[in-house]
From Swiss-Prot:
Species assigned in the record: Cereibacter sphaeroides (strain ATCC 17029 / ATH 2.4.9)
Keyword Protein transport: no
UniProt name for this protein: Cytochrome c oxidase assembly protein CtaG
Function, as annotated: Exerts its effect at some terminal stage of cytochrome c oxidase synthesis, probably by being involved in the insertion of the copper B into subunit I.
Gene Ontology biological process terms, A to Z: respiratory chain complex IV assembly
GO cellular component terms listed in the entry, alphabetical order: plasma membrane
Membrane topology reported for the UniProt record: Single-pass type II membrane protein
Amino acid sequence: MSLSPHQKTAGGLVLVVAVMGAASFAAVPFYNWFCRVTGFAGTTAVATEAPAEVLDRTVKVRFDASREAGMPWEFRPLQREMELKIGETGLAFYEAYNPTDRTVAGTASYNVTPDAAGGYFAKIACFCFTEQVLAPGERVEMPVTFYVDPAIIDDPDGRYVRQITLSYTFHETALTEEQAALAAESATDVN
């Protein structure tokens, strides 16, 4: 059975659309993985504990929040900035609110600017390490514990950093079957 040129073209176009759809679905997790592995685009380090050394020099850390188009949550930092000593542990909070009538899951991608600070900005604990699930009308405060590594002062570019911006963008993710079943059960219980 031979395909006509029109059928081959239509089949090729369907394949292109399917590949593009699959690539867009996988883009956020792949980008997060790529940035963590390479340190690209100011991706931060992950640490288990703060350094023993705390310097007298301070750095101002600013906090930024945004949402991917279509993400229905409200999302914001609870403080705009803080100043801390290099090596000192900082604790900041972000707030997320789900104003919809459905359960919504999301993950946060993150980066630090300037890029020279990315490898020296370390998170000990962060809401961005796991998926967040908010029920309808739920509001949560989400912490991030971090520090700026004292090694930054030995870096030819990093030593001039006086201000760092930590940015998060929340992306909606599909609910797992278990989460969707719990959400449906909760909605049924209300009615």
